[in-house]
């Protein structure tokens, strides 16, 4: 059995490994470069492999950004601010970030926001209204929704009760 720390790969082996890595799930360039460093590849080999992955459509930043934004909004119910921060953290270009934010409509965004806000407000067991408002605001801001949306919804929910 080989020791993973001492394993070396040829360019072809590493390319094959990264084709599988990128085929399994959308990846950004930063994730691929990190994986290449884990495989102890030299910079010249990294360049060859990355060019191969881009040429054969295994690696596409625009596709990654759109898929990331769509999934995080629909599944994890993240707001625009959190999505933008995460994409910037992954070193995605501003152009691709703007394209990614167009993956969901304004109506879908507001519907997700309202559903999440109402569910959070109803499920909170906090009896002190000030603590409840604080927890609600913190939760929604942590999810990445705009502060004006959060505080307008908070006023609306407080008035309903």
PLM region descriptions:
Residues 1-161:
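An alpha-helical, amphipathic repeat domain used for nucleic-acid recognition
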């Amino acid at each position: 059995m080989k020791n993973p720390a001492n394993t070396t790969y040829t360019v072809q082996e590493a390319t094959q490994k990264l084709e599988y890595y990128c085929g399994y799930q959308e990846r950004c360039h930063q994730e691929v470069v990190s994986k290449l460093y884990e495989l102890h590849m030299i910079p010249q080999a990294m360049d060859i492999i990355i060019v191969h992955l881009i040429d054969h459509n295994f690696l596409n930043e625009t596709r990654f950004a759109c898929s990331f934004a769509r999934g995080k909004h629909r599944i994890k119910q993240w707001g625009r601010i959190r999505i933008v921060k995460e994409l910037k953290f992954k070193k995605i270009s501003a152009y691709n970030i703007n394209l990614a934010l167009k993956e969901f409509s304004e109506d879908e965004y507001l519907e997700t926001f309202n559903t999440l806000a109402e569910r959070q407000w109803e499920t909170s067991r906090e009896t002190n209204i000030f603590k409840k408002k604080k927890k609600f605001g913190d939760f929604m801001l942590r999810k990445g929704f705009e502060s004006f949306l959060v505080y307008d919804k908070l006023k609306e929910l407080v008035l309903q009760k």
